Amino acid sequence: MVGSLFAAETQTVEIINITQNSKVEVYTALFWAPCKEAKLLLQSRGIDFDAIMVTFSRKKVNEMAKRTDGKTFVPQIFVDDQYFGGLKELISYYKEKN
């Protein structure tokens, strides 16, 4: 399911909705088109977000990897402190919303 978390141990699915009141964090990098696209998509929907720059910061890359169970590519998106996914999941989420 797009835009959701799956907890294998409990076999439950939690749907994450992005609203204008959501706390959204985007791990991003300079000069990387997928990051720019994710940020533009959120902005076009009126969603404020904190951009966490991983370029030149091993500390931020490690932080992101810890929060995403090892993912080290960007963008990585969190909504209300829950892992949402990357650009592909964000695009799919908004396609389902239309």
List the model feature ranges, each with a label:
Residues 68-78, 87-88:
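Structural micro-motif
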Residues 79-98:
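Non-catalytic, surface beta->alpha helical segment in thiol-disulfide oxidoreductase systems
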Residues 53-72, 96-97:
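Thioredoxin-like thiol-disulfide oxidoreductase module
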Residues 1-8:
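N-terminal targeting signals for export/organelle localization
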Residues 33, 56-59, 85:
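Short alpha-helical
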Residues 11-50:
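Local sequence-structure signature of Cys/Sec-based thiol-disulfide redox active-site neighborhoods
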